Amino acid sequence: MKTNANIKIQLRNLHKSFGKKIILNGLDLNVHDKESFVVIGPSGVGKSVLLKCMLGLLPIDRGSIIVDGGETSKLTGKKRNQFLKKFAIVFQGGALFDSMKIWENVAFGLIQGQGVPATLAKKLAIEKLELVGMNAAVGEQRPNELSGGMQKRVANARAIIMEPEILLFDEPTAGLDPVTANLINQLIRKCHDDLNITTFTITHDMSTVHTVADRVGMLNDGKIIWEGTLKEIAKSDNHFVQQFIHQQTFED
């Protein structure tokens, strides 16, 4: 049984608005240490805003973001930088640098953020590329030479090379064909299992839920309105959950 001691991330009464548009409206959520948690919901409900608030990329209006028992939403300077080292994020678009080789993209944080020598950083980058199913030769290519799915793999390698405690994924299968999406979903699960870390994924894709999730939360009207295990989601009598699942099935 999970206890409070197992909680890695606590979100308490989060509020975020843009003008009169309310995005997060008293959101509460616990994410346990080393679990794979997936937030689902249709496009436009605020999933990406939630991620950015968790990282401090957007300020919250009020509420608390607690990681490892410490309040983080008001951290500044060195304390904030230390907190951010716990996280790595794979953005929806991959956000690779076109002017750099693939290995340079993967090693960017090591070289620029930690001062790791380029020779060692390249070796570590190639190791991480191999971990996500790519070979050393790919490391010498540029992002525009790779498919969308391969770019997603590179983004995964760039995230895990930083050895985060918490790995965040923003709509990991967006824009991908079903075969490639399945490969990326399997890769996310592999990263979670092999690295034994906490993963937090936001998606509108039920195939991601089925492959990746230990537990699932449904975001609607600015709150997590339902949460449970993968087995429980199919049995849920929550109207919004069933409506979302039905729409996904229909679209597939």
Where are these regions (language model features)?
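Catalytic Walker B motif of ABC-type/P-loop ATPase nucleotide-binding domains
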Residues: 167-170
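Helix-to-loop junction immediately C-terminal to a conserved catalytic motif
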Residues: 55
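Conserved ABC ATPase signature
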Residues: 142-146, 150
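Helix N-cap at the start of a conserved alpha-helix in ABC-type nucleotide-binding domains
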Residues: 178-180
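Conserved catalytic motifs of ABC-family nucleotide-binding domains
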Residues: 163
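Conserved ABC ATPase "signature" region
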Residues: 71, 119-137
